[in-house]
Amino acid sequence: MWHTEWQDSKDIMMEHNNVILRVIDPANIDTVSALLLDQARVSLTEPGCERFEVYHSRSDAQTFLLIESWATAEDLDAHRNNKNFVEIYKPKVLPLVERIPHPSERLI
Protein backbone atom coordinates (compact mmCIF):
# COMPACT_ATOMS: atom_id res chain seq x y z
CA MET A 1 0.00 0.00 0.00
CA TRP A 2 1.40 3.40 -0.98
CA HIS A 3 1.17 6.28 1.47
CA THR A 4 3.12 9.37 2.38
CA GLU A 5 5.51 9.27 5.30
CA TRP A 6 3.45 11.82 7.23
CA GLN A 7 0.22 9.89 6.93
CA ASP A 8 -0.96 8.57 10.27
CA SER A 9 -0.79 4.78 10.48
CA LYS A 10 -4.23 4.87 12.16
CA ASP A 11 -5.67 6.34 8.96
CA ILE A 12 -4.19 3.54 6.86
CA MET A 13 -6.10 0.95 8.87
CA MET A 14 -9.41 2.84 8.73
CA GLU A 15 -12.33 1.84 6.56
CA HIS A 16 -13.05 4.54 3.98
CA ASN A 17 -16.40 4.15 2.29
CA ASN A 18 -17.44 6.65 -0.37
CA VAL A 19 -20.87 6.31 -1.92
CA ILE A 20 -22.40 8.03 -4.92
CA LEU A 21 -26.18 8.26 -4.78
CA ARG A 22 -28.22 9.35 -7.79
CA VAL A 23 -31.84 10.23 -7.09
CA ILE A 24 -34.02 8.43 -9.63
CA ASP A 25 -36.94 10.90 -9.65
CA PRO A 26 -35.99 14.59 -9.29
CA ALA A 27 -39.19 15.10 -7.28
CA ASN A 28 -37.48 13.16 -4.45
CA ILE A 29 -34.33 15.28 -4.16
CA ASP A 30 -35.49 17.23 -1.09
CA THR A 31 -36.69 14.05 0.62
CA VAL A 32 -33.39 12.28 0.01
CA SER A 33 -31.44 15.33 1.16
CA ALA A 34 -33.35 15.51 4.46
CA LEU A 35 -33.00 11.78 5.09
CA LEU A 36 -29.25 11.86 4.38
CA LEU A 37 -28.74 14.78 6.76
CA ASP A 38 -30.57 12.82 9.47
CA GLN A 39 -28.48 9.75 8.71
CA ALA A 40 -25.27 11.79 8.96
CA ARG A 41 -26.23 13.31 12.32
CA VAL A 42 -26.90 9.87 13.79
CA SER A 43 -23.87 8.24 12.17
CA LEU A 44 -21.50 10.84 13.61
CA THR A 45 -22.52 9.72 17.11
CA GLU A 46 -21.80 6.04 16.45
CA PRO A 47 -18.69 4.34 17.88
CA GLY A 48 -15.84 4.37 15.38
CA CYS A 49 -17.30 7.01 13.07
CA GLU A 50 -14.40 9.32 12.28
CA ARG A 51 -16.02 11.08 9.34
CA PHE A 52 -19.47 11.15 7.77
CA GLU A 53 -20.01 13.90 5.23
CA VAL A 54 -22.87 14.42 2.80
CA TYR A 55 -22.29 16.42 -0.37
CA HIS A 56 -24.92 17.56 -2.88
CA SER A 57 -23.55 18.11 -6.38
CA ARG A 58 -23.71 21.63 -7.77
CA SER A 59 -23.48 20.33 -11.33
CA ASP A 60 -26.12 17.57 -11.04
CA ALA A 61 -28.92 18.13 -8.52
CA GLN A 62 -29.78 14.42 -8.55
CA THR A 63 -26.35 13.38 -7.26
CA PHE A 64 -25.18 13.09 -3.66
CA LEU A 65 -21.83 11.90 -2.34
CA LEU A 66 -21.29 10.30 1.05
CA ILE A 67 -17.77 10.28 2.44
CA GLU A 68 -17.35 8.00 5.43
CA SER A 69 -14.38 6.92 7.52
CA TRP A 70 -14.69 4.26 10.20
CA ALA A 71 -12.05 3.24 12.74
CA THR A 72 -12.47 -0.46 11.91
CA ALA A 73 -14.37 -2.78 9.59
CA GLU A 74 -16.32 -3.91 12.65
CA ASP A 75 -17.46 -0.32 13.29
CA LEU A 76 -18.66 -0.04 9.69
CA ASP A 77 -20.52 -3.35 10.02
CA ALA A 78 -22.11 -2.16 13.28
CA HIS A 79 -23.18 1.04 11.49
CA ARG A 80 -24.94 -1.04 8.84
CA ASN A 81 -26.90 -2.76 11.62
CA ASN A 82 -27.72 0.49 13.44
CA LYS A 83 -31.42 1.22 13.95
CA ASN A 84 -31.31 4.40 11.83
CA PHE A 85 -29.56 2.62 8.95
CA VAL A 86 -32.01 -0.31 9.06
CA GLU A 87 -35.19 1.72 9.62
CA ILE A 88 -34.46 4.90 7.66
CA TYR A 89 -31.63 4.54 5.13
CA LYS A 90 -32.42 1.10 3.75
CA PRO A 91 -36.22 1.39 3.43
CA LYS A 92 -36.57 5.14 2.74
CA VAL A 93 -33.43 6.25 0.90
CA LEU A 94 -32.30 3.22 -1.09
CA PRO A 95 -35.58 2.77 -3.02
CA LEU A 96 -35.25 6.38 -4.25
CA VAL A 97 -31.66 6.22 -5.50
CA GLU A 98 -29.16 4.36 -7.60
CA ARG A 99 -26.26 3.56 -5.26
CA ILE A 100 -22.65 3.13 -6.31
CA PRO A 101 -20.38 2.27 -3.35
CA HIS A 102 -16.66 2.92 -3.53
CA PRO A 103 -14.77 1.31 -0.64
CA SER A 104 -11.54 3.25 -0.89
CA GLU A 105 -7.93 3.38 0.15
CA ARG A 106 -6.74 6.83 1.13
CA LEU A 107 -3.53 7.71 -0.71
CA ILE A 108 -2.72 11.05 0.93
Residues covered by each model-derived region:
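A generic beta-sheet turn/junction motif
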Residues: L36, P47, R58-S59
